[in-house]
Amino acid sequence: MRNNELLESTAERLKILKAVASAVRLDILEYLKDPTGNFPAQIDGDRVRDGVCADFIREKLGIAAATASRHLTLLTDAGLLFATRKKGWTFYRRNEQAIRRFAKQLQSDL
């Protein structure tokens, strides 16, 4: 494994660990792994290419909009999700490269 494939700092690793240290956030990552299987079709935005509308994620989780927003922001700030604004809505999709990189780092650390 080359060094550039690993996360650069302990702070970066801790930020990601904190982001995934929640059952709800782990559920979000799991649901977004199969967006077409877990969410209904959207009028604006392709579920795979553009991501899933935050409102559909909130509905799937059965939580308040503010709570969903906080969870999605933590995952996005940690680099595990991409957020895309489109026609007044925010769509989220997984950052597969960052997830793989974190998994490699975790395996290396432990």
Where are these regions (language model features)?
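Short, hydrophobic-biased segments on the C-terminal half of alpha helices
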Residues: 72-73
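N-terminal helix-turn-helix DNA-binding core of bacterial DNA-binding proteins
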Residues: 15-18, 24-64, 90-97
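Beta-hairpin "wing" of winged helix-turn-helix
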Residues: 77-86, 93
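Short, charged/polar, Gly/Pro-enriched secondary-structure boundary elements
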Residues: 98-102
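A common structural junction motif
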Residues: 109-110
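N-terminal leader segment of winged-helix/HTH proteins
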Residues: 1-27, 31, 77-80
